[in-house]
């Protein structure tokens, strides 16, 4: 099994994420490229700390990272990385947990956000998949993405939103049942 290690340090207005000790890249497709890893870190920070900062390259200026080359988070070419989004899901949960613990430890309990969709990232990703056979006996599969309507942002002293979308897809959502 691959392991993802993350040490987060806050110094003044900056954050530093060190992923030393993370598993080396694999011969399977359980690898992520550096751009994908960086994007998933940005998503986690957008939904926990930087929610009110405009989307721009400046958003990540106060963030420094050490991501070992040749690890599952920074694989070397020509490593397969078809499961990069799955690695990213786990990374988002990891970064969110680090940030939430930092805010909680600072005593700013009102500012602690729960990560979105509970722990869905660890149980299969942003949807549910099921299958069976159609009336002609042909195997079929189906994906259900109702999780895009999951809540987010609850804190110890306040409710979150009821349908915030999926954390890894900030603009996603589901149809309003009253309008269908």
Please state what every model-predicted region is.
Residues 1-180:
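Glycine/proline-enriched, intrinsically flexible loops and inter-domain linkers
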């Amino acid at each position: 099994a691959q392991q993802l290690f993350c040490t987060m340090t806050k110094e003044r207005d900056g954050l530093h994420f060190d992923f030393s000790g993370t598993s080396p890249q694999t011969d399977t497709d359980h690898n992520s490229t550096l751009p994908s890893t960086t994007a998933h870190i940005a998503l986690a920070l957008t939904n926990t700390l930087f929610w009110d900062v405009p989307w721009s390259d400046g958003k990540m200026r106060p963030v420094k990272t050490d991501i070992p080359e040749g690890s599952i988070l920074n694989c070397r070419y020509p490593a397969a990385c078809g499961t990069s989004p799955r690695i990213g899901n786990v990374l988002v949960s990891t970064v969110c947990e680090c940030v939430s613990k930092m805010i909680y430890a600072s005593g700013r309990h009102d500012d602690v956000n729960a990560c979105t969709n509970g722990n869905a990232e660890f149980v299969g990703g942003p949807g549910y998949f099921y299958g069976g056979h159609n009336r002609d006996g042909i195997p079929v599969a189906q994906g259900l993405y109702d999780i895009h309507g999951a809540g987010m942002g609850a804190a110890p002293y306040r409710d979150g939103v009821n349908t915030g979308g999926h954390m890894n897809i900030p603009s996603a959502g589901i149809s309003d049942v009253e309008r269908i």
